[in-house]
Amino acid sequence: LEDNGRTHWAVLVA
């Protein structure tokens, strides 16, 4: 999986 933390925030902010 890619950066778990990064993706997490990206989806929330999206």
From Swiss-Prot:
The lineage of its organism: Eukaryota, Metazoa, Spiralia, Lophotrochozoa, Platyhelminthes. This is Newly excysted juvenile protein 2.
